[in-house]
Amino acid sequence: MCGIIGYIGDRKACEVIVKGLKRLEYRGYDSAGVVTGNGETLDVRKGAGRIDKLTEKLGFLEMEGNRGIGHTRWATHGVPNDINAHPQKDCTGKIVLVHNGIIENFAELKEELLKKGHVFRSDTDTEVIAHLIEEELKGSENFEEALRKALNKLRGSFALAIVYADEPDKLYVVRNESPLVLGIGEGEMFAASDVPAFLEYTNKVIFLDDGEYAILTKDSYVVKRIDTGEVVEKPVHEISWTLEMAEKAGYPHFMLKEIYEQPRAIKDAIHGNREIIRSVAEEIANYDKIIFVAMGTSYHAALVGKSLFQRLAKKVPIVEEASEFRYEFEDLIDDKTLVIAITQSGETADTLAAMKLAKKNGAKVLAVVNVVGSMATRIADLTLYTHAGPEIGVAATKTYTTQLTVLTMLAIELAKVLGTASEDYLEKLEDELMKVPELVELALKHDEALRELAETLKDKRDFFYIGRGISVPTALEGALKLKEISYIHAEGLSAGELKHGPLALLEDGVPVVAINPSGKVFDKMVSNIEEAKARGAMIISLSDREELSRVSDVLVKMPEVDELLSPIVYVVPLQLLAYHLAVLRGNDPDKPRNLAKSVTVE
């Protein structure tokens, strides 16, 4: 949540910052602000609202100076208003900073600072940091020393970008449990919450680790430990994807573009893991205590992974929400445990916390991640990348299907290593996986029909999504997509659960979306669909079997695909349906209310 962009160089800082903030909008925000200035005067402008309107209202692009920082805020402490927007400053106005994260001990620090005469303007935990640095500066030889002293008193998560009026040639940035990446240019330096913010200018990046801070000038950088002040040598990575890959490319929304990018993304996921998948499978083959941890859409991918591991590798994993893992499994993790953490961003706070606990207790940790160099990859013992490329829309689409692709590859390879499935079947499944991008292309051909269907459904108040077996996670994901961008209540569940309560909610015209590929539970699903139909529900079926039209009001005819691969293909029409319903209801599917792309606070 929230976004940071910092710049120091020869360009007009405000222009770099406003562009960067626009490219961080997908992270979600309710207010924004900018500070620039080369000398002793720092120009701070901020307010509640969208960046475009604030730029016009406050004149962001009129701000002078070649050094500056910008911020988009998602309120955690203090309501979203002009005063609580970032940047925040100290009593003197010389220390100005922006912050992502949550300071857990801000109340006690604020009380101490109030007693020492500090005057606070906002209700934020962020302002406490500025005043704390100001206080430490009184007994320090220089600003860096004061900064380190202050940082060592903070508890919680924080990514910071700081300018100090008396040091006009420096920009300070800090990372602790909240993402921050440096961009290394020629005669200029950048810092941001995510690479797209500065990718127009450089593809050379340094990923800060927790407990590190950096001092940037236009020509140099140094990274140090917060606790000791020791210099840390950091590798410079080159980002392979381009800014154009992160732009809309003619689509009305990023989400639709990313839905249509799935055939290519799935191919990249397959080709990107061919060489490494065998060695990973061999390394995890002997673990019987396996726990998947994830949140949101990644959690649904984990549920599919569980089915694949059971059906192919004859393993019986547990799937746990990362937010609950620490409280339920703390005493159950040991060196005989394999934890598979799935996170698109590699920065999801709950998932990182679960990974750290697992490592602390001696478990082997495998991360399935999209973002190269993210914190999850640095915690994990093993990493499989999904190679989806940048995903800007808040609602996960191509990152989900590439997660499923990688988990399918891993389950197949694990079954080969363990000899738990016939070689002929595994070879057939691999061949069919190679054809999945073509099957997704076929699924995308339903786009216009689904838009027309959405026209008839846009005023519905409730939806139910049902599936059985490996299709249950697809039902859950379809429901999540619908509610997060269309704001229609939706419930995903096992079709067998209908008669245990939800059936009472079905009445004339309530849409029930049934996911029913050919497979061992097909006939059972037909019975469940008939139960819903008898209560007056409007049945929308996804299936490769034409006979399902007998019990369906709408049949979305799907291509034939092995049941174990069906989650990758069958989720695509559900993404499109959710997208069209959101647009028809006047919502921006790229920026759903109250949500953020990367949830970096717990």
UniProtKB/Swiss-Prot annotation:
<keyword id="KW-0963">Cytoplasm</keyword>
<dbReference type="Pfam" id="PF13522">
    <property type="entry name" value="GATase_6"/>
</dbReference>
<dbReference type="GO" id="GO:0006002">
    <property type="term" value="P:fructose 6-phosphate metabolic process"/>
</dbReference>
<dbReference type="InterPro" id="IPR005855">
    <property type="entry name" value="GFAT"/>
</dbReference>
<keyword id="KW-0032">Aminotransferase</keyword>
<dbReference type="InterPro" id="IPR035466">
    <property type="entry name" value="GlmS/AgaS_SIS"/>
</dbReference>
<dbReference type="GO" id="GO:0006487">
    <property type="term" value="P:protein N-linked glycosylation"/>
</dbReference>
<dbReference type="InterPro" id="IPR046348">
    <property type="entry name" value="SIS_dom_sf"/>
</dbReference>
<keyword id="KW-0315">Glutamine amidotransferase</keyword>
<dbReference type="GO" id="GO:0097367">
    <property type="term" value="F:carbohydrate derivative binding"/>
</dbReference>
<dbReference type="GO" id="GO:0006047">
    <property type="term" value="P:UDP-N-acetylglucosamine metabolic process"/>
</dbReference>
<feature type="domain" description="SIS 2">
    <location>
        <begin position="453"/>
        <end position="592"/>
    </location>
</feature>
<dbReference type="InterPro" id="IPR029055">
    <property type="entry name" value="Ntn_hydrolases_N"/>
</dbReference>
<protein>
    <recommendedName>
        <fullName>Glutamine--fructose-6-phosphate aminotransferase [isomerizing]</fullName>
        <ecNumber>2.6.1.16</ecNumber>
    </recommendedName>
</protein>
<feature type="domain" description="SIS 1">
    <location>
        <begin position="280"/>
        <end position="420"/>
    </location>
</feature>
<keyword id="KW-0677">Repeat</keyword>
<dbReference type="GO" id="GO:0005975">
    <property type="term" value="P:carbohydrate metabolic process"/>
</dbReference>
<dbReference type="InterPro" id="IPR047084">
    <property type="entry name" value="GFAT_N"/>
</dbReference>
<dbReference type="InterPro" id="IPR001347">
    <property type="entry name" value="SIS_dom"/>
</dbReference>
<dbReference type="InterPro" id="IPR035490">
    <property type="entry name" value="GlmS/FrlB_SIS"/>
</dbReference>
<feature type="active site" description="For Fru-6P isomerization activity">
    <location>
        <position position="597"/>
    </location>
</feature>
<dbReference type="InterPro" id="IPR017932">
    <property type="entry name" value="GATase_2_dom"/>
</dbReference>
<dbReference type="GO" id="GO:0004360">
    <property type="term" value="F:glutamine-fructose-6-phosphate transaminase (isomerizing) activity"/>
</dbReference>
<comment type="subunit">
    <text>Homodimer.</text>
</comment>
<feature type="domain" description="Glutamine amidotransferase type-2">
    <location>
        <begin position="2"/>
        <end position="219"/>
    </location>
</feature>
<dbReference type="Pfam" id="PF01380">
    <property type="entry name" value="SIS"/>
</dbReference>
<comment type="function">
    <text>Catalyzes the first step in hexosamine metabolism, converting fructose-6P into glucosamine-6P using glutamine as a nitrogen source.</text>
</comment>
<dbReference type="GO" id="GO:0005737">
    <property type="term" value="C:cytoplasm"/>
</dbReference>
<feature type="active site" description="Nucleophile; for GATase activity">
    <location>
        <position position="2"/>
    </location>
</feature>
<keyword id="KW-0808">Transferase</keyword>
